[in-house]
Amino acid sequence: MEPHFDVNPRANRDLDEHYLYIRRDSPEAAVRLLRAADSTFRQLARTPYLGAEFPVQRPDLAGLRIWQVEGFRNYVIYYRPIEGGIEVVRVLHAARDVPAALDEPG
């Protein structure tokens, strides 16, 4: 069975927001970000423990890990290994207040 990745709705909104922000200055870079995120999700699905553990207080986020979007070091993927792949929880800019962002409603 091919490893898979599930992108939750909040992470999809993150990607949409990043795309729209970058597109204002560089439509090509915005498309590259989405392609790089997809490629990185696939890589992480194949090797789910590649990313570093990210400590969290919330039990529902236990096992959270982080990894940069390939070629976009300021964009960080927060994900959890799941059976057969990964669940992408958030995709945040490195300057964000991560604990606050993780507490935002879905």
Residue ranges and their predicted role:
Residues 31, 35-45, 64-67, 71:
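PIN-domain endoribonuclease scaffold, especially VapC-family toxins
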Residues 1-36:
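Arg/Lys-rich, positively charged N-terminal/basic patches that mediate binding to nucleic acids
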Residues 10, 39, 97:
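Residue-level recognition of oxygen-bearing side chains
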Residues 69-106:
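Enriched for short, Lys/Arg-rich terminal
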